[in-house]
Regions:
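Soluble catalytic domains of enzymes that build or remodel membrane lipids, polysaccharides, and related
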Residues: 12-254
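Selective detector of the "anchor" transmembrane alpha-helix that sits immediately C-terminal
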Residues: 251-276
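Internal/C-terminal transmembrane anchor helices
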Residues: 1-14
Length: 276
């Protein structure tokens, strides 16, 4: 098993895409979701040559964004609230095409209230707001940018293996947007390390935009050669040229199933040995 894992490791370059494309992309870190700040940083990134600019999670309602005209000629992918009938989603949106992915792993109590129906009458009695976001469907189409499919992940969805594998399989790179401002001092750095691990795991670039840090563009091949990330609390942007990679690593093909099967075999052998 260990020999097989070593043979299939990313260092063997088994998962490099011969038809890879280059894309100059930027992440924006506004610290606060203010359109004046976003506009300033976005224009700087565009002037720096960025073809696509990534905004963080939950910038504003998408209807509010669509009412503005200063971003009409810029390819922006960002996090917005989408109101559809009586439902509200938090989504990644390609603002050039209006294609979107709705977050499906919502944060309990922060984005939705567990046992909502059971607690509705109690909330009304104590005058507690009862609004929750709506969970996105499990099966959603991939969002494209310049006809390139990417994996869109919002906040802690990066940590859900099944969501990560499902959204990242058969895509060219990963966009991760988040608002880590409420996590405290240490969690943003841990979130960034997890993003770096996902880059290596999938052999795809991770483009990570957060509200107030830590934002970065992460290479799966040699992370040391890239410029510094944007530290927490700093208004800035970062631009890098990334390479697309449509190939799937072993993990993206099989997910956690090999580990689960191996664990089951170990437990089964232990039980058999115990009963001898």
């Amino acid at each position: 098993m260990l020999l097989l894992v070593g043979f299939l490791s990313p260092n063997k370059n088994l998962f490099l895409d011969e038809d890879s494309r280059q894309l100059k992309i930027a992440v924006v870190q506004p610290v606060e979701n203010n359109y004046k700040i976003l506009n300033n940083l976005t224009l700087q990134a565009k002037n720096d040559g960025a073809e696509v600019i990534i905004w963080p999670e939950a910038v504003s309602s998408y209807q509010n964004f669509q009412a503005r005209t200063e971003f009409a000629d810029i390819d922006i992918i960002g996090g917005f609230f989408i109101q559809q009938d009586e439902k509200i989603f938090t989504s990644i949106v390609n603002t050039s095409t209006n294609d979107r992915y709705d977050k499906r792993n919502l944060v309990p109590f922060g984005e939705f209230q567990p046992f909502d129906n059971l607690l509705k009458n109690l909330n009304e009695f104590f005058n507690i707001p009862n609004s929750s976001l709506t969970r996105g469907e499990k099966s959603q189409k991939k969002v494209l940018i310049q006809q390139i499919p990417f994996s869109g992940l919002i906040c802690w969805e990066l940590s859900f293996n099944d969501t990560f594998v499902d959204r990242t399989r058969n895509t060219a790179f990963i966009i991760h947007i988040s608002n880590d401002s409420w996590y405290g001092k240490y969690m943003p750095a841990q979130h960034l390390l997890h993003a770096k691990a996902r880059a290596i795991e999938s052999q795809k670039w991770v483009v990570r935009s957060t509200t107030d840090g830590i934002s970065d563009i992460i290479s799966p091949y040699n992370q040391k050669k890239l410029s510094e990330n944007i530290p927490k609390g700093i208004k800035s942007f970062k631009t890098e040229t990334i390479s697309t990679n449509m190939k799937n690593t072993t993990y993206l093909i099989f997910g956690d199933y090999p580990l689960l099967i191996f664990s089951f075999i170990i437990i089964l052998l232990a039980l058999i040995n115990k009963n001898k």
